[in-house]
Regions:
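Glycine-rich phosphate-binding loops of nucleotide-dependent enzymes
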Residues: 2-235
């Protein structure tokens, strides 16, 4: 079943057109990746879906509802959460305080269960619960950013460059956790410059070039595509 459908969206930063007719889908429980070079429009696509940088034209449908003009905070409530590039943790707040912000639109006993779930996924966050986020390593901050997004109980998790600037051993752990999150029923739309890693994690992918979808296929086909190999896989 299609959970997210993006249809011919164009997104602008002032006079600059960053997205030039992007269309894509994500099914319930699926992992889909966007790959491409810097400036291809990957992060802007996530920002448009999440409502942070609204699309100028086109439509975005989530769970059967048009969310193209829905404010970002309402999109979170409807079930889409973004873990942004660069993590954007609040450095002077503790791990627990950062996580609590992810649930600030929610009420009820389920929040305590979600803290437990995040701590089960990322034991380091439990160990550093009272530590200031600004004193943590890049990998730990990435765990915190993903954990904070999960506190919103999303149906769709948007991950923007989760391996950026992180030691390889922590990249492995984060991708293991992404797999666990997906197996729990959360669909994931993943942006990565590490195309090998992204295609290994996803069932399908879209290659973006200068704000357009240049290629869309299953991950195995993209892995074997000579153009993708030359441009993004280092082969």
């Amino acid at each position: 079943m299609t959970l997210l459908e993006v249809s011919d969206i164009h997104t602008h930063y002032g006079a600059i057109e960053a997205l030039k007719g992007i269309s894509l889908t994500v099914d319930a429980g699926e992992v889909v990746t966007l790959i491409g070079s810097n400036g291809a429009g990957k992060s802007t696509t996530l920002r448009s879906i999440s409502g942070l940088t609204p699309a100028s034209t086109g439509t975005i449908t989530f769970a059967g509802e048009d969310i193209t003009r829905v404010p970002a905070h309402e999109i979170v409530i409807r079930g889409i959460a973004l873990a942004p590039e660069g993590r954007h943790c609040f450095p002077r707040m503790t791990v627990r305080e950062n996580l609590d912000l992810g649930a600030h639109r929610r009420r009820g006993p389920g929040i305590a269960e979600d803290f437990d779930r995040v701590y089960d996924l990322f034991p380091r966050l439990k160990e550093r619960e009272r530590q200031k986020a600004g004193t943590m390593s890049g990998g730990e901050q990435q765990m915190l950013a993903i954990g904070r997004a999960l506190m919103a109980r999303p149906k769709l998790l948007l991950l923007d460059e989760p391996s950026l600037g992180i030691a390889p051993i922590l990249v492995e752990r984060i991708y293991e956790t992404i797999g666990e999150i997906n197996r729990s029923g959360v669909a994931i739309l993943l942006v990565e410059q590490n195309a090998n890693r992204a295609l290994d994690a996803a069932s399908r992918g879209y290659v973006l070039e200068t704000g357009r979808v240049a290629l869309a296929s299953d991950s195995a086909s993209l892995h074997n595509d000579p153009g993708v190999q030359r441009a993004y896989l280092g082969t």
